[in-house]
Amino acid sequence: MATLFWLIVFLGACFALIYNRVELRLSTAILGAVLVAFTSFSGAGLFWLFILWVLFGGFALLNVEALRRERLSAPILDVLKKLLPRLSDTERAALEAGSVWWEGELFSGMPDWRQLTRLPAPKLTEAEQAFLDGPTEELCSLAEEWPITHDLQDMPEPVWDFIREKGFFSLIIPEEYGGKGFSPLAISMILAKLASHTGTTSTTVGVPNSLGPAELLLHYGTEEQKQRWLPGLASAQEIPCFALTSIHAGSDATGLVDSGVVCKGEFDGEEIIGIRLNWDKRYITLAPVATVLGLAFKLYDPDHLIGDRDEYGITAALIPTDLPGVEIGNRHLPIGIPFQNGPTRGKDVFVPLDCIIGGKEMAGEGWRMLVELLSAGRGIVLPSNAVGGAMAAVYATGAYARIRRQFKVPISEFHGIGEALARMTGYTYIMTAASRVTCTALNEGEKPAVPTAILKYHNTEMSRRVANDAMD
């Protein structure tokens, strides 16, 4: 009986040390003391005591760092390297993109919640609040979903004019280039407000203020490119889109086959070294009405005109849509929502090297650009649209449940209906809170890749569940 008791004490000590992640040397001392007590009082046989002391001796040797690394860590690492697939450069770029924010505490296993509560809550500036209360509310009153969706299959011209006039396409562009220079929180709240009224408007406004020509130029463009394009984008004289999705690759961005070959050609009457582009993209929002096309393609230089490499990889460039060979105008109709979305094609389109965002020095850096900017951008547009859609569903469903009566009682009084309404409200609260706390990081200049990816998935998924409950 004594042996069983001390065995339980010994195993309990091992479990407690592991659970609390006690430092190795202290763990060794504690286990040694417990083993001495076990040897003295348990009455166990010499054979089992010998086994336990041998195991403890092996454990104690782990305190010799050089020996541990050479005899244990290195062989285990070699085995794991052979078992794990080799990371490609594109995969490594995706994994290393962005920054680590408070979520690092979560993944440590021992998060400091006080650190989260000490973070400053993001607030709107006076200009941002005025824009949310003024032009955003006006746009909601102008854009009526029924005629947009069922009669016009587009936003009416007064709505387009209002969006241009009030600078809705320039929310992320700094004031020095004619934009609003709003914070991520402000953009998130503006898009959520628009999405609570009409998905067409929120999507149309969201695209120029997310991953696209303006954001790429702000982070990677040359000063000449910024001066050339940003004022026009801010005033909406230029309508941007970003063509990433290849018809052959879909969401596998690294598998795109759209190509650009460095060669000599004629541009504006002069023979220059440029890029001859061929692409076939689809599901590109704003492509049917775009004047400038952000294009992702794979760059090749078979004649080594710009360097000693044959292939540079994914590259991002800005292409005016009025160039010969560029095809836009056709439309898709995603799930019946008539925001401008469609295919774009290019056949032997010749452009100068300075169309590459950041200049020719950034050739082949397109994938890195995209994954770094996605680390922040995906935490704003889709999550905000999901919040706005969920809010609209909760408002409409809750009101309907109060005025719709069955058996002389509002259906909101029925437990089944009340349960669905409670679930919808809870999901909407979670989505809103998650968006706000993520905007806290974005407002501080962080690019938290993991939280934004989690937020994008869960907000859209919870929005789908809210929609299901609303329809039920």
Question: At which residue positions do the language-model features occur?
Answer:
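Amphipathic, small/basic residue-rich leader segments at the start of a protein or domain
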Residues: 5-17, 26-38, 47, 51-208, ...
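Alpha-helix capping/hinge segments and adjacent helical runs
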Residues: 103, 447-472
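Beta-sandwich/jelly-roll carbohydrate-recognition scaffolds of carbohydrate-active enzymes
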Residues: 228-231, 245-270, 282, 302-304
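Internal maturation/activation junctions in enzymes
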Residues: 231-258, 439-446, 452
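A short core secondary-structure module
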Residues: 270-327
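Catalytic nucleotidyl-transfer cores of nucleotide-processing enzymes
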Residues: 291, 299, 323-348
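A glycine-rich, basic-preceded beta-loop-alpha segment at the flavin cofactor/substrate interface
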Residues: 329, 343-378, 395-412
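Extended amphipathic alpha-helical segments enriched in small hydrophobics
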Residues: 378-445
